[in-house]
Amino acid sequence: MLYKGNKLKVIDLQGEQVSDMVLFNATDKREKISSGKTMDFENTILITKGHHLWSNRSIKMMEILEDTNGRNDFLLAPCSPETFQILYKNPEYHPSCFENLYTNLSQFGIEPDEIPTAFNIFMNVQFAPDGELSVDPPQSKAGDYVLFEAKMDLIVGLTACSAEQSNNYSFKPIQYEIIT
């Protein structure tokens, strides 16, 4: 739980590690983070310091107070077993952000189908003039962080991304701090 006015600091301890984050209103879990509303109301796909993360009900959920890296993604869904099968042509089982999120959020009554598009902290998604997307290595360095302030009481799901392509083919921990 993150209460209104609390701050959440997400830290890339070693550099080049993405963290997927989803948000739910703590009093009504049907209200959740929305990539579409956020990009609409912030008028950009490059969400960083000074921007807000908006809900599917057009209400501010968080504000980004600081962002030492400045590159995050809100276009791509959390990686799932299907991501590895379809996109990366990996027929073997692979752990995923989607599974990490729904498994750990189930204690709050959140089902897999309720997991929204995550705010992908430190993820470096590039887009060509023709619209083609590519996932490049994160630009984050050891110690980079994003500081958020909760605008309502929130259930926060946070995971270190397990997709090789998103993390320059290495997996590292993500640290977080809650500041009251």
How would you name each of these model-derived features?
Residues 1-180:
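Acidic, Ser/Thr/Pro
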